[in-house]
């Protein structure tokens, strides 16, 4: 659920999710939702597809074909590619986006930047995420009116391995007196915390939620703060 003025939503999931949004007050008024109840690509009036190599020197090439709506779900798929040429390739380049001759993996990253921006309230995502080695699904928001990290970043969900141990994370970042220097507040919960309670955790859908007002940001997974 989203109501975050000057914040846009970025989804880098590798599987399915429906998305809702509510306004901020004690009775929760719905202000926007996307139930992904069409077939094919996402609505261009709401969603953008990131393209190519984007951030963090990651292995995947982002493209629209890997994110489609099917049967009321948004399905985002990571794929292993074979003999696919990187169109940006320049031999001897020092740019990580251009030094790779071949694209080894593709996936999708979709955002609402410039189309849906909100401030305060409740943001809720129902999703099933991949937990295979190498997976890095994420749901996060960025401010839209200045460069990172001064714009702020809220990571409602991330999953990846820390020193070989799978974790689910919730993070917030903001600017410092150094350009590109972020201050982070992070909570990393070992994945085993969830599978000890439910061995079938990975096969089920779960609800990630952010409650945000003028004083505090609270991030939940299945109502657990």
Residue spans for each PLM region:
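Hydrophobic h-region of N-terminal signal peptides that target proteins for export
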Residues: 13-22
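Bacterial N-terminal signal peptides that target proteins for export
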Residues: 1-9
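Compositionally biased regions
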Residues: 9, 16, 109-110
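GH16 jelly-roll
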Residues: 24-225
């Amino acid at each position: 659920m989203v109501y975050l003025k000057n914040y846009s939503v970025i989804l880098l999931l590798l599987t399915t999710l429906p998305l809702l949004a509510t306004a901020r007050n004690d009775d929760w008024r719905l202000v926007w939702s996307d139930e992904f109840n069409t077939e094919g690509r996402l609505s261009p009036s709401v969603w953008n597809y990131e393209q190519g190599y984007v951030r963090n020197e990651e292995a995947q090439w982002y493209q629209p074909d890997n994110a489609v709506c099917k049967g009321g779900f948004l399905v985002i798929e990571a794929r292993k590619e074979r003999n696919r040429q990187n169109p940006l390739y320049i031999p001897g380049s020092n740019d990580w986006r251009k030094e790779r001759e071949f694209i080894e993996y593709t996936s999708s990253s979709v955002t609402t930047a410039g189309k849906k921006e909100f401030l305060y309230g409740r943001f809720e995502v129902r999703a099933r995420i991949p937990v295979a080695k190498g997976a890095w699904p994420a749901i996060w928001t960025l401010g839209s009116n200045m460069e990172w990290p001064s714009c702020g970043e809220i990571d409602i969900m991330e999953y990846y391995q820390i020193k070989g141990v799978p974790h689910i994370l919730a993070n917030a970042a903001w600017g410092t007196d150094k350009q590109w220097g972020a201050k982070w507040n992070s909570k990393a919960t070992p994945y085993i915390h969830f599978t000890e309670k439910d061995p079938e955790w990975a096969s089920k859908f779960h609800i990630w939620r952010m409650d945000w007002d003028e004083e505090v940001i609270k991030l939940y997974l299945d109502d657990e703060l």
